[in-house]
Structure formats: structure tokens, C-alpha cells
Regions:
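A glycine/serine/threonine-rich, flexible loop-to-helix segment
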Residues: 133, 186-194
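Short alpha-helical
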Residues: 11, 83, 132, 184, ...
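A conserved pocket-lining segment of Rossmann-fold NAD(P)-dependent short-chain dehydrogenase/reductase
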Residues: 88, 140-144, 169-182, 193-216, ...
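Conserved active-site region of classical short-chain dehydrogenase/reductase
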Residues: 100-108, 187, 219-222, 226
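Short, solvent-exposed loop/helix junctions and linker helices
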Residues: 6, 89, 97-100, 149, ...
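N-terminal Rossmann-like NAD(P)+-binding domain of SDR-like oxidoreductases, especially those catalyzing
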Residues: 1-179, 311-314, 325-332
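C-terminal substrate-binding subdomain of Rossmann-fold SDR/epimerase-dehydratase oxidoreductases
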Residues: 15-19, 58-59, 197-333
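Hydrophobic alpha-helix immediately C-terminal to the catalytic Tyr-X-X-X-Lys motif of short-chain
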Residues: 155, 159, 163, 193, ...
Length: 333
């Protein structure tokens, strides 16, 4: 099968690419496209640029202009997206451009080139905040996004629906929970907190730290996506989860304990506007395909910390601008 992986040097996309290159060379003829518009994507590119796959440096907005050398793709797997909620708050247009118009361009490319299969990597945030302790969103629930980021991803899901009904493209949508693991962009909560700990800075938490997230190791996400590709039904949506929930205080303490620190190293900062209280998804539909998460949280967190510590010099070279951009994070309560 000829596959095109978009956003192949982003966080989840790169973990997916690595797995395909290591374990699925006999199943997939792999091509990738990425704009390389940030330093960590360039680092990931350098790690695999000698591997056996075709890479195209371009933004998905310009995919119609790329010469793919008559590849005749069977499937596009779309990881390309702007994904940081904080950035979406002060620059929503960036997310409309990438996450909505970019997806439309990819689907139009499918129509023009007779590509029958499309995998859209969405997010659990499209459901909005869970309002009760026992509320878990299922795939058929109404979308209620809160941030410009989640609204852009929900919009992309709707565009996928339209292309499926209008043009007959076989589309599967995947909505993972909050991911963590190696190669994650340093502005995200876990790597950002690890960076602060390494630099003897306080771990900064929005509001009172009571917000709850559903944590999913990226390697479990990759195996879930592969399961949907192989066994999922066209036109369906699949949540990916782990059943592991922590509020931000609990998560911060788990990180600090790994460095023999305690809650005195936590600093509470002004809350994010429109901050969802809880994300929670039911993933029985994916389990029915024969998938289950296999990574235990503490061990996966240790692997994540190890990767961030080993790459701390490079991460620190690129994180200072991120610190400056995250204006809300540094406004004390």
C-alpha cells in the first residue's frame, strides 16, 4: 500500500513514521510531507533522513504543487496540524489556516488524484469538557469545542464528513486523548514541566490545578491508529484512550517525585481562558477491534522523562522563545 503521512515530523506523526519504518516496511510504501516549520520537526527529520522513505518538504496548503512522481497513493494519514491551545488563543487564524483549510486542501487533493482512503487524526477536545465525574464521551456525541484549536479540529471533522458524502472518499476519524511521550514539542505540559525542573524552575500550573486530563502514551496511540487502518470501518470515528486520569496537580507531583521534589516546587499561574475542566472518552469501540493500551503510566512517564533529559540541551536551545510566547502562563494569580 502506498501511503502519504502528513505532518510526519510532528510529535504523533513522527512516532507513527518510526513505527512504520521499523515494523511495516513490507506492508507500506511510505512517503511523508512536512513543512519543517519549527526546530523540533527539523531535529526529527535529521534522525531519519537516511531511512527508506520519500520525504517532501512542503506545507499541506501547497500540496497541489508538489511533484510526487506519480506515486499513486492509496491512503493519506493526516497528522499535520497546529495543536497548542495557548497559541490558538492569541493566534486563531493560524489554526484556521492549517487545521481547516489545510485539511480541505488534502481532501481536494484526494479527489483530484483518485485517492480513496483518508485517515484524519482529530482530538478528544472536540467534545468539549465532561461535566460529570462519570461522563465519558462516545463517538456519536455532539461536538462542543471550547478553544480555537478544538474548534478548528471539529471543523476539520465536519469537512471530512462532507467530502465522504459528496465525493465518496473512505474516511476514518480518530480522536486520541492527551498524548505524552518522546519527541513531544516542548511547549506541551509534560515536557515543559520537565524543562522547568531541569532548570531548577518551578512547575507552573494553570488555575488551581484541578483540571483533569485523560493521559495516553504516544506508542499506544500509534498502535491504535494502526488497528483502525487495518480493521476500522470507513465512515466511522474511533476514540483512543487509556483509562488513566490525573488532574494537573497530581500530574505535577508525579513528575516532581521522579526528581525527588515535592509540591513546594509548584507555582500556580493565571488560568487559561475557556479552560476545559475535564476530557474523558469511552474507547470501547476501538477495543472491539481487538486493541487495548499496553503501557503502564509510571513506566511510560519514566521513558518520557529519560528522553527529555537526554535531549535537554537541544530542547533548551529552542524553548526560550516558547516561554516568551506563552504570555498567559507567566501571569501570577
Amino acid at each position: 500500500m502506498n501511503i502519504l503521512i502528513t505532518g510526519c515530523f510532528g510529535f504523533i506523526g513522527f512516532n507513527f513514521l518510526q513505527t512504520c519504518l521499523e515494523d511495516y516496511q513490507d506492508d507500506f510504501n511510505i512517503s511523508g510531507i512536512d513543512s519543517l516549520n519549527n526546530p523540533y520537526s527539523k531535529l526529527n527529520h535529521n534522525l531519519v533522513k537516511e531511512r527508506n522513505f520519500e520525504f517532501y518538504k512542503e506545507d499541506i496548503k501547497n500540496i497541489m504543487n508538489v511533484d510526487f512522481k506519480n506515486k499513486n497513493f492509496d491512503m493519506i494519514i493526516n497528522f499535520a496540524a497546529e495543536s497548542h491551545v495557548d497559541t490558538s488563543i492569541y493566534n486563531p487564524a493560524l489554526f484556521i489556516d492549517s487545521n481547516i483549510l489545510g485539511v480541505n486542501n488534502l481532501l481536494n487533493f484526494c479527489v483530484k488524484n483518485n485517492i480513496d482512503n483518508f485517515i484524519q487524526i482529530s482530538t478528544d477536545e472536540v467534545y468539549g469538557s465532561a461535566s460529570k465525574d462519570n461522563e465519558f464521551f462516545v463517538e456519536s456525541d455532539i461536538l462542543n469545542p471550547s478553544s480555537p484549536y478544538s474548534a478548528s479540529k471539529a471543523s476539520a471533522d465536519m469537512i471530512c464528513n462532507a467530502y465522504e458524502k459528496t465525493y465518496g472518499i473512505n474516511i476514518k476519524k480518530i480522536r486520541p486523548a492527551n498524548n505524552y511521550g518522546p519527541f513531544q514539542q516542548p511547549e506541551k505540559l509534560i515536557p515543559f514541566s520537565i524543562s522547568n525542573i531541569i532548570k531548577n524552575n518551578e512547575v507552573e500550573i494553570y488555575g488551581d490545578g484541578s483540571n483533569i486530563r485523560h493521559w495516553l502514551y504516544v506508542k499506544d496511540t500509534v498502535s491504535g491508529i494502526l488497528k483502525v487502518i487495518e480493521y476500522g470501518k470507513s465512515g466511522e470515528i474511533y476514540n483512543i484512550g487509556s483509562g488513566i486520569y490525573f488532574n494537573n496537580n497530581e500530574l505535577a507531583l508525579k513528575l516532581l517525585e521522579k526528581f525527588n521534589l515535592d509540591s513546594s516546587s509548584i507555582k500556580y499561574v493565571k488560568d487559561r481562558p475557556g479552560h476545559d475542566f475535564k476530557y474523558a472518552v469511552n474507547f470501547d469501540k476501538l477495543k472491539a477491534l481487538g486493541w487495548n493500551p499496553k503501557y503502564e503510566f509510571d513506566l511510560a512517564l519514566e521513558e518520557t522523562i529519560k528522553w527529555n533529559v537526554e535531549n535537554s540541551k537541544w530542547l533548551e536551545e529552542n524553548i526560550e522563545q516558547i516561554r516568551k510566547n506563552r504570555k498567559l502562563r507567566f501571569e501570577s494569580k
